[in-house]
């Protein structure tokens, strides 16, 4: 079971990024496979925020185009949205206290807590996930 970080979704969509070709090929393989894929709500929001922002991408995606990508992904059988369960806060709190991290890594800690709570491995090009004890992190672009 894989939990996908926003950076891989952004790389898979934005053709101007150097990671695009590799990320797109990986994402298409995942979507056509049988492994259970979770996308956290926070990553959906990050995808929308970043891909539609003209200060980040020129040209940015229109809101309609960004939403169409998300709808397409969510229509795939192995894909589901992932929300925190009842044990999420305890796991997140422990990760933050164990690592002494918060600030810019708070969202990463939230994603790590989702993965630990629900049995996922985090797939991300962000190697900061290695900092969280007990979390399985895979960078599919480093292979």
Regions found by a protein language model. Give the residues of each.
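Acidic, PIN/NYN-like endoribonuclease modules and their adjacent C-terminal/linker elements
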Residues: 1, 112-143
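Short, well-structured N-terminal submotif of metal-dependent ribonuclease cores
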Residues: 1-3, 7-39, 54-68, 143
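Acidic active-site catalytic centers that drive phospho-/nucleotidyl reactions
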Residues: 5, 108, 126
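Structured helix-beta-strand junction loops
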Residues: 33-34, 76-77, 118, 132
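Active-site neighborhoods of divalent-metal-dependent phosphate/nucleic-acid chemistry enzymes
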Residues: 60, 78-123
């Amino acid at each position: 079971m894989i939990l996908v970080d926003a950076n891989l979704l952004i790389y898979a969509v934005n053709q101007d990024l150097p990671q695009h070709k590799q990320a797109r090929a990986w994402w298409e393989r995942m979507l056509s496979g049988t492994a259970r894929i979770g996308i956290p709500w926070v990553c959906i929001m990050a995808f929308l925020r970043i891909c539609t922002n003209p200060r980040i991408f020129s040209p940015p995606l229109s809101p309609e185009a960004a939403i169409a990508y998300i709808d397409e992904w969510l229509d795939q059988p192995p894909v589901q949205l992932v929300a925190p369960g009842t044990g999420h806060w305890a796991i997140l709190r422990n990760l933050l206290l164990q690592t002494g991290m918060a600030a810019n890594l708070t969202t990463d800690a939230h994603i790590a807590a989702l993965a630990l709570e629900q049995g996922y491995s985090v797939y991300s090009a962000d190697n900061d996930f290695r900092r969280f004890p007990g979390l399985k992190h895979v960078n599919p672009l480093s292979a």
